[in-house]
Regions:
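Short, electropositive alpha-helical surface patch
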Residues: 147-169
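Short, solvent-exposed loop/turn segments at secondary-structure junctions
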Residues: 64-66, 105-108, 142
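Positively charged, polar, low-complexity stretches
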Residues: 52, 67-70, 78-81, 88, ...
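Conserved catalytic cores of phosphodiester-cleaving nucleases, focusing on short active-site segments
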Residues: 85-106
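Charged phosphate-binding loop/patch that engages nucleotide di/tri-phosphates or the phosphate backbone
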Residues: 2-23, 170-195
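Nucleic-acid nuclease catalytic cores
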Residues: 123-153
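Mg2+/Mn2+-dependent nuclease catalytic core
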Residues: 101-128
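Acidic-basic catalytic patches of nuclease active cores, encompassing PD-(D/E)XK
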Residues: 17-78
Length: 195
């Protein structure tokens, strides 16, 4: 079974249609990204259960505005502040912080998916000796790449590009093996690139 076969299987649920009044054939972009993150979360659980590392999904702090006390449910809330990156943790004594991005485009990841407050945070992680990278899922190609933040940010700043090309990511990133367990084995790439 190849990487493409495995990712196609994982992304199969991403092709479900979201019905709305304007376009009943539109694909839910939020669900597509959440499925990718769910696969990362499952991989992280496996890593933790096997005592390989401790990497967790970071939650974005919210301020509760209204709550239904009978059902013990939040009915209205706002984000307190911007989030930093999606995941953080420790592997072999080194701090890790990374962001996960998914695109349905075959040739690029739009730059508007990379937020400046996250870039600032990830640069600080690097400045203090941590490991910072992006996991980029080209779901149409059934390929996931790990790309180091320093390499990515230098490219963005030097080219003034509006998107990050697939060719750049393929050339400068590292293909992540897809398996049954762990689903997205990015830890193997981290061992090769950073240790």
């Amino acid at each position: 079974v190849t990487n493409k076969d495995l990712l196609a299987l994982f992304n199969k649920k991403n092709t479900r249609k979201k019905r709305n009044s304007d376009n009943p054939q539109s694909i839910s972009r939020a669900n597509r990204g959440m499925d990718f993150e769910n696969d990362i979360n499952i991989s992280n659980d496996w890593y933790r259960e096997n005592n390989l590392c401790s990497i967790l999904k970071r939650t974005t702090p919210i301020k509760v505005l209204k709550m239904d006390s009978k059902e013990k449910r939040i009915t209205s809330a706002v984000f307190e502040k911007q989030s930093t990156a999606d995941y953080n943790g420790v592997f072999r004594g080194r701090y890790i912080d990374f962001e996960a991005k998914s695109t349905m485009l075959k040739s690029s990841l739009p730059l508007d998916k990379i937020k400046m407050h996250q870039v600032k945070h990830l640069k600080e992680v690097i400045k203090h000796g941590g490991i910072a990278f992006y996991l980029i899922n080209f779901s149409v190609r059934s390929e996931i790449y790990l790309i180091d933040c320093t390499c990515l940010f230098n490219h963005i700043e030097s080219t003034q590009c509006k998107s990050i090309s697939y060719d750049f990511v393929k050339t400068n990133g590292h293909l992540v093996n897809l398996k049954y367990v762990p689903r997205i084995d990015y830890l193997e790439v981290i061992k090769t690139v950073y240790f």
